[in-house]
UniProtKB/Swiss-Prot annotation:
Catalyzes the reversible conversion of ribose-5-phosphate to ribulose 5-phosphate. GO terms for biological process: pentose-phosphate shunt, non-oxidative branch. Its EC number is 5.3.1.6. The keyword Isomerase applies. GO terms for molecular function: ribose-5-phosphate isomerase activity. InterPro entries: NagB/RpiA_transferase-like, Ribose-5P_isomerase, Ribose5P_isomerase_typA_subgr, Ribose5P_isomerase_type_A. Homodimer. It comes from Streptococcus gordonii (strain Challis / ATCC 35105 / BCRC 15272 / CH1 / DL1 / V288). The gene is rpiA. This is Ribose-5-phosphate isomerase A. The active site is at 104 (proton acceptor). Pathway: Carbohydrate degradation; pentose phosphate pathway; D-ribose 5-phosphate from D-ribulose 5-phosphate (non-oxidative stage): step 1/1. Pfam families: Rib_5-P_isom_A.
Amino acid sequence: MENLKKMAGIKAAEFVTDGMVVGLGTGSTAYYFVEEIGRRIKEEGLQIIAVTTSSVTSQQAEGLGIPLKSIDEVDLVDVTVDGADEVDPNFNGIKGGGGALLMEKVVATPTKSYIWVVDESKLVEKLGAFKLPVEVVQYGAEQVFRRFERAGYKPAFRQKDGQRFVTDMKNFIIDLDLGVIENPIEFARELDHIVGIVEHGLFNQMVDKVIVAGKAGVQVLEANK
């Protein structure tokens, strides 16, 4: 599995050229993309500026000597490469398993070419088997949680080291065990209107390419947007 992730990450780096502003994703597959960008800077003299989607990725990039700016210091991002937890045939996806969904979506929004790197196990017919992360402000988080309980969404506060997980933006994450999301577009709209929710892990019709590594090799799927 790790080898498949590495293959996808290295393939994605082929879409990066000199002079670009590059969004560096978060997670186990995006990790290999960041490593490859670091190698190209060191060995090939690749010249880019990068923005990151989490404190973890920032630390990785700094260790590799990748020059960084904040998202507010750039107007547009040429290409962002990130992982995904599930991708359906309509190129809707669930992200946020690593807890960085808000920053990931902030960086994805001004990106010209948004690419996901996944192994073939992440391709699904319908979203929802992977728990959907919902980032909520700490104030009133129990109110949102109880609302989800009443709706039958089987919510659970994400935990880390025996305490509630806190995101880089100092929010909580509630994971929803939905099983199947029949209409991701409609469900995203519902979540967007709930006060206290900062962001959710449904990334619908945002991605331009999905790089999939499998037993047969690496393929690049083009989204029909």
